[in-house]
Amino acid sequence: MTRSIALLGSTGSIGRQTLEVARELGLSVAALTANKSVDLIEQQALEFCPRLAVLYDEDAARELRARLSDTNTQVLSGMEGLLAAATADDADTVVTAVMGMIGLQPTLAAIEKKKRIALANKETLVCAGELVVDAAEKYGAEIVPVDSEHSAIFQCLQGCRDRGEIKRLILTCSGGPFYGLSLQELAIKTKADALKHPNWTMGAKITIDSATLMNKGLEIIEAMRLYRLPLRQVDAVIHRQSIVHSLVEFHDGAMLAQLGTPDMKLPIRYAMTYPNRAVSPAEPLDLLKCPPLTFAEPDEEVFRCLKIAKQCAAIGNVYCAAMNGANEEAVAAFLRDEIGICAIPDLIEAALDKTETVYQPQLSDILEADRLAREVVREKLN
């Protein structure tokens, strides 16, 4: 393939797997970005020879600049560097694999340059979905989701000529490591317990979100924004086997599902090659060896983060951004062993109680809601 990518977040789980796919497909890499992982991005830059490498942390960027001084790779830092990578003229596809709100501005900048967006940064759509989708339509940019669930929905809708035919999008959810526990049992679970996802290998933050089911809440909001559907048309079910990645139900009673092994390189590869499909070295799904496929309703009283996310989805406005910011701060505190897992929804609710509705919110309002929510959580922690 001749596609050239700018990879935002190259040292995280999705970023590393994206480079594996790039290697398999023979893609060129125009830009790499990370936070401050000097050693890993140096290795990546030496292999893929990007024109641009970015470390958000200035001290780390200074060290990388010295290490790559005898190469043709330019090293930048900060948001300026991220924006340069996202708008690189020699990249036709921007893979947004960074975690959190930091991916929002680079994504919007890439959209204005009419890039294909391979979207793995769910916070972009959760916090500013209407702005992002409106911008993509305005500039003619293509958004291809990388999340396994949204990739599944995207694939199921390829033959759908009229979105009015959709009755429901159904996102599947493994249930995480704590499926079936009571609230009392959940309260004593530790960080080590929460990081043991039954089916997927992911980064720490998204693994904790999967344990609290916040990840599914974020994905419900993401689907609402991406396909412009109300909450009543987007649902989630527990599917422990992670074989059915999501389903679309149509008004005529038909239901389409996308099945596959739980391997993130499959949706990454599809986002790189769409509308075509490339031969994959991955082990194919063997239907004769599949376990029985089961589906169940999530327990929103135990996993309150899912309930909170749905409430914010129904309200809209800046509440999704506030919820996301508060969740990021609370999860970070949990990963530092400062709070228990059941304190995460408590902190999110405390931040939402302080959030005020903004009439027709703009990007600045969304960023401010995120900032204030984080501030509330930090004050509670102190």
Task: For each feature predicted by the language model, list its residue ranges.
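Catalytic, metal-anchored helix/loop core of enzyme active sites in primary metabolism
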Residues: 1-382
